Amino acid sequence: VPALHGAPGIYSARYAGRHGDDTANNRKLVAELRGIEQRHAYFYCAMAFLLHAEDPTPILATAAWHGTIVDQAVGNNGFGYDPHFFLPELGKSSALLPATVKNQMSHRGQATAKLIDQLAQLA
């Protein structure tokens, strides 16, 4: 979240202290954004494919999924910050998306598709 200088960042699973406490993590995120108008947020995924541990030319794929953070949790699908991650282009939170749609749109889905495309070009 740029307004929070990149937090929660790589600590997203343990942002509120205990690893995997989605409710506490979301509560802390919303509290820290209280009074902040700029609520842009994004998820980022970086993947690397190596043929072996010393591979000098790994295949890299990255992707970001942009949205905004909303105060009220909406939806029950997904996990983590999904209920508060609002997608303006769809008019809904990522927790309202069916898994098949989320898997295509998300940062992980996009990075995976890019990696598969790069691997296919090698064949």
Spans of model-derived segments:
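Anionic-ligand binding patches
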Residues: 1-123
